[in-house]
Amino acid sequence: MDHSGHGMDMDLPPFTLGRGLQFSADPFFLIGCVLAIGLYAYAVLRLRRRGDGWPPGRIVFFVVGVLSIALVMCTKLNDYGMVMFSVHMVQHMVISMLSPILLLLGAPVTLALRALPVAGRGRTGPRELLLKLLHSRYMKIITHPVFTIPLFIASLYGLYFTPLFDFLMGSKTGHIAMMVHFLAVGLVFFWPIMGVDPGPHRPGYVMRMLELFAGMPFHAFFGIALMMATTPIVGTYQHPPASLGIDALSDQGWAGGIAWAFSEIPSVLVLIALVFQWYRSEQRTAKRSDRAADRDGDQELQAYNAYLASLQARGQ
């Protein structure tokens, strides 16, 4: 497939990590990354000027999440991803699974709700619009697991095993739209599972773990399908430039291995985050119970002991 419409030199030298990490910004994603960090920093500054704090860990997570997008979209990895299936798969896995998790751990919605000013009575400002969106029927639908899990799976099988992938890769606009789609799908999939930001759905911890593991095996199956294929699956990568010195089928096998192996990394990250949240939730519950006991003299325990004493008296 001709990629000259992307404005890239098709005679790329053989891929190395050093060459792949050279700066080569996509204007759309470069501007988006700069804006994201700028707006986040502005919101944090508003809180601090007001005398409120914001956890440094959340700042680190969000910034690293944005930088992970820049890493795969504003370097030569983006150029090599147009002609090498394996490099494209790295982009896909990072921008759809790793970046969303890091961004969500930064709690951008919570930050926005705290930083945006409350509009006057009877008025609608940005904060009120955001709250309305969060509680809208549309948001309830697109964050429900009945929608997010099939969408997460379809972004693999419905894209790579149909002509849609070749169509999107045929233009710069299509390629950008595909990458934005990957990021959006990752965000709506992991948002209710992570449970860091407020949203329409907040299932229990066990249910969130089940939702996480419901989608992950399909990544492994997809990777295995690529590795076991005896012919190139997508037309875009059937004839890589001779200057790369690679075989299309071998490169596809590497892409499958990346998809298979990478699915484990986000699962572990999210599982650690969920266990930590669960532990902190139990701690808060225990502290509330202790405070209640201190206030009422632990009447609940006294009532239970009295009940046991009455049972013992009846038995005598």
Question: Each PLM stretch: what is its role?
Answer:
Residues 1-316:
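Alpha-helical membrane segments of multi-pass proteins
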